[in-house]
């Protein structure tokens, strides 16, 4: 094989690798951004830090995301709000009773969001939403409202099927949301203040909260 043929024969391989690398960049940037947003918060995270952690230039980052705000929105959609289509489909296909559905909802939320780094987004929003009203409105529309709507559907299903007593859904949803928020805050903040023997076991905590919730909501408990 001639020297010229040797180099020519490798050109397609190099091009393919570069193309694959290019296709992977948005995901790598989102992973890096999630890490830094959770570690440092939104305000303290700089675009050049995200780019450096992803192994690209700042200019490359802005080829994919026009601003830090757009990058944050993409992180939220990738890790949380973009999954509501999947979660609502699970609601439609679920065949068990409503107590089992609520149990599935809370346990699955922990497995898919709460136990992952993405749960730090909740703490970030609680800390910084007031300073970034556009992001607060975005989070309300894409995470809070769809999440509460899904919980309302579960509780309404239970009432319609005669499994749950009549509830004020405007407030009952918070009986489900509040324990999850506490678990996230414990994971990302309060655990630092606790001894090892005081740390919450997430699975046991969720099981305990479910037991209390279902006892209070079930027709048989009234």
Predicted regions and their residues:
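Membrane-interface starts of transmembrane alpha-helices
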Residues: 165, 169-173
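Hydrophobic/aromatic residues within well-ordered alpha-helical segments
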Residues: 25, 68, 79-83, 98, ...
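Short secondary-structure transition hinges
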Residues: 111-152, 196-199
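Basic, helix-initiating cap at the start of DNA-binding domains
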Residues: 1-40, 44-56, 63-70, 96
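C-terminal peripheral helix-coil segments that are non-catalytic and often amphipathic
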Residues: 1-16, 100, 104-108, 145, ...
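Amphipathic, non-transmembrane alpha-helical scaffold segments
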Residues: 22, 30, 76, 136, ...
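Amphipathic alpha-helical linker/stalk segments
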Residues: 75-117, 121, 156
């Amino acid at each position: 094989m001639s020297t010229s043929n040797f180099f020519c024969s490798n050109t397609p391989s190099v091009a393919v690798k570069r193309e694959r690398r290019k296709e992977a960049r948005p995901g790598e940037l989102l992973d890096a951004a999630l890490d830094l947003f959770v570690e440092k918060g939104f305000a303290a995270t700089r675009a050049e830090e995200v780019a450096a952690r992803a192994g690209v230039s700042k200019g490359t980052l802005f080829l994919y995301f026009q601003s830090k705000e757009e990058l944050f929105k993409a992180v939220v959609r990738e890790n949380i709000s973009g999954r509501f289509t999947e979660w609502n489909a699970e609601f439609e296909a679920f065949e068990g009773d409503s107590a089992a559905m609520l149990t599935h909802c809370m346990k699955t939320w922990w497995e898919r969001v709460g136990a992952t780094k993405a749960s730090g987004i909740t703490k970030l929003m609680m800390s910084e939403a007031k300073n970034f009203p556009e992001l607060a409105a975005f989070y309300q529309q894409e995470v809070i409202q769809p999440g509460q709507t899904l919980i309302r559907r579960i509780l309404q299903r239970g009432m319609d099927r005669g499994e749950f007593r009549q509830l004020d859904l405007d407030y009952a949803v918070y009986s489900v949301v509040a324990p999850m928020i506490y678990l996230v805050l414990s994971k990302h903040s309060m655990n630092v203040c606790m001894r090892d023997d005081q740390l919450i076991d997430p699975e046991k905590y969720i099981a305990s909260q479910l037991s209390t919730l279902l006892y209070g909501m079930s027709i048989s408990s009234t």
